[in-house]
Amino acid sequence: MAIKTYKPTSPGRRAQTCSTFEEITACKPERSLVENLKKSGGRNSNGRITSRNVGGGHKQKYRIIDFRRDKTEIPAKVATIEYDPCRSARIALLNYADGEKRYILAPLSLKVGDTVISSEQADIKPGNALPIRCIPLGTIIHNIELKIGKGAQLARSAGTFAQLMAKEGKYGQVKLPSGEVRMILMDCKATIGQVGNADHENVSIGKAGRSRWLGVRPHVRGVAMNPVDHPHGGGEGRTSGGRHPVTPWGIPTKGYKTRTNKRSTPFIVKKRTK
């Protein structure tokens, strides 16, 4: 993937950059693997806002992605590399030898015509899925399960990867994109390689309207509000908020640790650094 820049024909164009989409090989998705996607506007089932600054955006179709990689021992050929509006990574359409079709996250360097497989005896090459116990130490991996058979939950966004650091007992130690080192059961599956579209982080939105296309609404600063709306609100003229930074609900922010202890806490070998 490469980044495309524009001539400064307008203030919005001046700062804007975009993907060239040169790796995309198909315009329309596989119809059998597409669902309608209903937008929530950040509201829950009671109609109350649970995610602020969410709403609007272009209409999207949801592509059903195979995060379990549970179709084992059957090779599949990469038919297309496609754009997915619901995630930052690209997706790859697999045609299995028995005729079934599935989407997976497209790893870096995966191309049309390549063959991938989910197997304990699979080669260590991008796109193949194996249990952690079958993966050599130091291997770059992504799309990692936390619970056996639940489906991948870690290292799924564009350009991310994790690394298998050690194996001890029934757990493998995996260094995650955040810098956290975590113990994961050896029978959990992971996919070899790094997630594709690594230049996604270098794309500049360029203008407010493009954020609205993506379903992102304006984020208003607390000091610009009234006292009834935010702890930093009010005051005569411009103020600094008058206290240490807090969320709209009064919880300290900007560096304050808010993670509570959970049943999974003992599985964290080293805390995150990002």
UniProtKB/Swiss-Prot annotation:
Keyword line: Ribonucleoprotein, Ribosomal protein, RNA-binding, rRNA-binding
GO molecular function: rRNA binding; structural constituent of ribosome; transferase activity
PROSITE patterns, per the entry: RIBOSOMAL_L2 (PS00467)
Membrane-spanning parts: none
Region (Disordered) residue spans: 224-259
This protein's GO CC annotations: large ribosomal subunit
GO biological process terms held by the UniProt record: cytoplasmic translation
Subunit-structure text: Part of the 50S ribosomal subunit. Forms a bridge to the 30S subunit in the 70S ribosome.
Biological function: One of the primary rRNA binding proteins. Required for association of the 30S and 50S subunits to form the 70S ribosome, for tRNA binding and peptide bond formation. It has been suggested to have peptidyltransferase activity; this is somewhat controversial. Makes several contacts with the 16S rRNA in the 70S ribosome.
Annotated NCBIfam families: rplB_bact
The family this protein is said to belong to: Belongs to the universal ribosomal protein uL2 family.
The protein's name: Large ribosomal subunit protein uL2
Gene name in the database record: rplB
